[in-house]
Amino acid sequence: MSKKLYLIIRIKGEPDAHPDVRKTLENLRLLRRYAAVVYPADLPGLEGMLRKAQAWITWGEIRKDVLAKLLEVRGRAPGDKKLTPEYIKEKFGVNSFEELAEKIINGEVVLHKQEAIKPFFRLHPPRGGFKKSIKKPYRSGGEAGYRGEAINELVLRML
């Protein structure tokens, strides 16, 4: 049984953000621009937080192959150590990042509750830049807000 997972990326800073929005971004663990987190879509309260911060973030459903690449390239262990195949074998009993991504998607490993992996990923700005305005919603020709499967192409440009 695979669960729907949201990859949430912060795309704007916060100088003019309302205090409620700042607190929401903090609760989502999106403390800096280009930080990303992965949460199950059915997490209680997540929809409200996404709606409140939608002008500062973009999100969508992540694919298994993209999650595996994100863990391999940008995943960090406590102490800011890079994730290695030996480390994930010791902590999770899996042989590859693809197997770990499969366990996360199936709900056997809950990424935001893990102590063995940092709960956020620090990304680069997208290669080639944002194609549209970060001030407008995605459905209106911008970059912010819900974007569905298109989040995968964006995050691959940010690794």
Swiss-Prot record:
* Gene3D superfamilies registered for this protein in UniProt: 1.10.15.30, Ribosomal protein L30, ferredoxin-like fold domain (3.30.1390.20)
Q: Which InterPro entries match?
A: Ribo_uL30_ferredoxin-like_sf, Ribosomal_uL30, Ribosomal_uL30_arc, Ribosomal_uL30_euk_arc, Ribosomal_uL30_ferredoxin-like
Listed GO biological process terms: maturation of LSU-rRNA from tricistronic rRNA transcript (SSU-rRNA, 5.8S rRNA, LSU-rRNA); translation
Question: Mind listing the UniProt keywords for this protein, alphabetically?
Answer: Ribonucleoprotein, Ribosomal protein
Tell me yes or no: is Transmembrane among this UniProt entry's keywords: no
Which GO molecular function annotations are given, in alphabetical order? RNA binding; structural constituent of ribosome
Record carries keyword S-adenosyl-L-methionine: no
**Under the cellular component aspect of Gene Ontology, which terms does the record hold?**
cytosolic large ribosomal subunit
> What's this protein's family per the entry?
Belongs to the universal ribosomal protein uL30 family.
Fill in the subunit field for this protein: Part of the 50S ribosomal subunit.
HAMAP family on file? Ribosomal_uL30_A (MF_01371_A)
Q: Which PANTHER family match?
A: 60S RIBOSOMAL PROTEIN L7, LARGE RIBOSOMAL SUBUNIT PROTEIN UL30
Q: What is this protein called?
A: Large ribosomal subunit protein uL30
Taxonomic lineage from the root:
Archaea, Thermoproteota, Thermoprotei, Desulfurococcales, Desulfurococcaceae
Per UniProt, what is the name of the gene that codes for the protein in this document? rpl30
